[in-house]
Design a protein with these regions (language model features):
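Cleavable N-terminal export/targeting peptides
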Residues: 1-39
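Short, aromatic- and cysteine-enriched interfacial helices/patches
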Residues: 2-4, 61-62, 156-158, 172
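A generic structural signal for short, solvent-exposed coil/turn residues
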Residues: 17, 23, 37-39, 78, ...
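Intrinsically disordered, low-complexity regions
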Residues: 19, 138, 175-177
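Gram-negative (and chloroplast) outer-membrane scaffold detector with strong preference
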Residues: 32-34, 51-55, 70-168, 172, ...
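Outer-membrane pore/translocation modules
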Residues: 33-68, 173-177, 181-203
Length: 203
């Protein structure tokens, strides 16, 4: 599983979360009085990059400290109503640790709910598949299992049907048994990813 990281990196991620929340609050306050109703219809797509913190555990190996690295998100789907969108979301994380490439990901069926027609804030949740892989040369440790996601975001309009959309997402995966070069390795593996991603969306 992942090696132990420094608490400084976790503090940096916490600072990014606070900054994203403050920016969202400020945008909401400015827009509440004069923002026009938002229109969601048909096909939509969005994606972007950011930063994330991963923690993991398994039976007999305990829990690791968080590791921070580059993170990304891609989502697409259709419109159920002006305030409810359905889609598929892929959340990923990557870091090279001492020559070993570590990747974490979730692929989920997701729902996005806008509590208000005139505000860009939305909540999201979904379920699907989670995966982990660590690779160094020909050696590979990997595992796959059930995954869940949850989070929130805010659409800041930049055009008729486009928006700048910062998002905070928490993903969880129950990977079960890990495999090392095809042979059973650690059991009871679980992982979480907390990410802040800055995306562009087209509705």
């Amino acid at each position: 599983m992942l090696s132990r990281g420094s608490s400084t990196r976790v503090k940096l991620l916490a600072s990014a979360l606070v900054l994203a929340a403050l920016c969202t609050s400020a945008t909401t306050a400015r827009a509440q009085d004069n923002e026009a109703p938002r229109v969601h219809q048909g096909f939509w797509i969005g994606g972007g990059l950011g930063y994330g913190s991963v923690s993991s555990s398994c039976d007999g190996c305990g829990s690791s400290d968080s590791e921070c690295g580059f993170s990304g998100l891609l989502r697409l789907g259709g419109t159920l109503s002006e305030q409810v969108l359905l889609g598929v979301e892929s959340d990923g994380w990557y870091k090279d640790i001492n020559g070993t490439t570590n990747t974490v990901g979730n692929l989920s069926a997701a729902v996005y709910v806008y509590p208000s027609k005139t505000m860009g804030m939305f909540l999201k949740g979904g379920a699907g598949v989670a995966g982990y892989q660590a690779k160094n040369g020909s050696d590979k440790l990997d595992g796959y299992g059930v995954g869940l996601i949850g989070g929130l975001g805010y659409d800041i309009p930049i055009g008729g049907h486009t928006a700048f959309t910062p998002m905070a997402t928490l993903t969880w995966g129950n990977l079960g048994d890990l495999s090392f070069n095809g042979q059973s390795s650690a059991s009871g593996a679980k992982q979480t990813l907390l990410q802040v991603v800055f995306t562009f969306s087209a509705y």
